[in-house]
Each structure stands twice: as C-alpha cells, then as structure tokens.
Amino acid sequence: MARKTNTRKKRVKKNIETGVAHIRSTFNNTIVTLTDTHGNAISWSSAGALGFRGSRKSTPFAAQMAAETAAKAAMEHGLKSLEVTVKGPGAGREAAIRALQAAGLEVTAIRDVTPVPHNGCRPPKRRRV
C-alpha cells in the first residue's frame, strides 16, 4: 500500500482589524484565544503550551507570556484593536490584559464574563495546609 505523505495546509493570512480576546484564567492555567468578531479563532496560546508546568503554570508571568505569544501571532493577521472578555478567578487575569496592551494591541473594552452560579454545585472542601 502506498504511504501517504504528510501535506500540511498553508496558513492563509487573514486581514482582520478588530477582534475579541477571550482570557480563561483558572487556578491551574491561563488560556488566551484571539478571535474575530464572529468568534472564529485567529490564534491562541496557554501557559501549559509554552512549557510552564505544575505550580508555575498558574502564575501571572505565565499568563503574560501566553498573551504575548497569542498577540504576536494575531498581529501577523492584521489585528490592531480588540475587546477583552475575562472568565475565571485565576491569578493571570490582569497580567494577560496588560501583556496584550504592551504587545501593541488597542484594548477598547474589558468585559468580565465569569459564570456565577445561582447556588448550583457544592464547592470543593476548604484546603488545610
């Protein structure tokens, strides 16, 4: 049987001026996804994808690096300004927003879309260290 050669599709350079940055910041990781206004992903990055492991993955510095990486990739597609939606209680929320601004993207709005339960699931037990 003939072996199939791995052919990767060439990335098409999109020309997108405005977009949305979705920052998901949990206690363990921070994921930054940059999309166009319709929600189609342009670029993404996370602290874990950059090689941070364990407790270092949840630091503000790791979130900053993830946001910078995602911003650089999105700026190659022509992204200039964006709205930011932040979800979750993690440490990397503010650091990720600051990193997006420092990368040269204009932040027009910041929206907190953290889901708040109307007394849904029982929370995890308190930690005793």
From Swiss-Prot:
Provide the Gene Ontology terms for cellular component: ribonucleoprotein complex; ribosome
Offer an example of a GO molecular function term for this protein.
structural constituent of ribosome
A Pfam family annotated for this chain is: Ribosomal_S11
Gene3D superfamilies, A to Z = Ribosomal protein S11
GO terms, biological process: translation
Recite the UniProt keywords alphabetically.
Ribonucleoprotein, Ribosomal protein, RNA-binding, rRNA-binding
- State the family it belongs to: Belongs to the universal ribosomal protein uS11 family.
| Its biological purpose | Located on the platform of the 30S subunit, it bridges several disparate RNA helices of the 16S rRNA. Forms part of the Shine-Dalgarno cleft in the 70S ribosome.
Could you identify this protein by its name? Answer: Small ribosomal subunit protein uS11
